């Protein structure tokens, strides 16, 4: 019988890097799965030690993970995922739910490497999953049903927000949210450096910049306002904010940000075609 949301689950990880650890940590801390019910594999002990510290089981055998876990999350590097899927394909059954968090590997590619009727889902996470504040999207393959999608979504919400989308949105999510973490960090750095230029100590400036981003994000989420409305709430005629915004517009801030998301998305689409 396939796993359902009410059944005990063993969750497997093939690949034990930072994203795999972040997801495992979120699942365990949220009580979605017991640490002893998590089994992770990797070629070496370099990353497995982090799983052991969580109380998880570890192995160097990918086959062992598939043999013991009905739900397996593949968190390998994208360039090695096809080889790994081909390796485990002989022991994949219709009882398995196969999940990939590797960028650039399409559902059709995974389905083509695995036995017919394999239930496959694809997840695009981002780095804040490490602190259980991730922004994730997921897409399902041809044979993954509603129960499979609900099960995975329920699990991953331990790591942040998880929304089911058409697969065509996954590469866009990579540009918006996967790469977007770096874009936001660049803005936070520049924000702080502006204050440093005006005489504020570096450590204080970076703390305030980060808190400003955090507080603004919470207001956008909790109040449900469009960013333009919240921005307008800060403006006063001839005040400091409108002068600062004018400087941003002169520098092409809005267009540069849109172009960054576009460039990252286009690159993600290129990688998906390889």
Swiss-Prot record:
Its EC number is 1.5.1.2. SUPFAM superfamilies: 6-phosphogluconate dehydrogenase C-terminal domain-like, NAD(P)-binding Rossmann-fold domains. Keywords: Acetylation, Amino-acid biosynthesis, Cytoplasm, NADP, Oxidoreductase, Proline biosynthesis. It catalyses: L-proline + NADP(+) = (S)-1-pyrroline-5-carboxylate + NADPH + 2 H(+); L-proline + NAD(+) = (S)-1-pyrroline-5-carboxylate + NADH + 2 H(+). One of its GO terms (biological process) is cytidine deamination. It is an enzyme of class 1 (oxidoreductase). It is found in: Cytoplasm. PANTHER family: PYRROLINE-5-CARBOXYLATE REDUCTASE, PYRROLINE-5-CARBOXYLATE REDUCTASE 3. Oxidoreductase that catalyzes the last step in proline biosynthesis, which corresponds to the reduction of pyrroline-5-carboxylate (P5C) to L-proline using NAD(P)H. Proline is synthesized from either glutamate or ornithine; both are converted to P5C, and then to proline via pyrroline-5-carboxylate reductases (PYCRs). PYCR3 is exclusively linked to the biosynthesis of proline from ornithine. Belongs to the pyrroline-5-carboxylate reductase family. This is Pyrroline-5-carboxylate reductase 3. It comes from Mus musculus (Mouse).
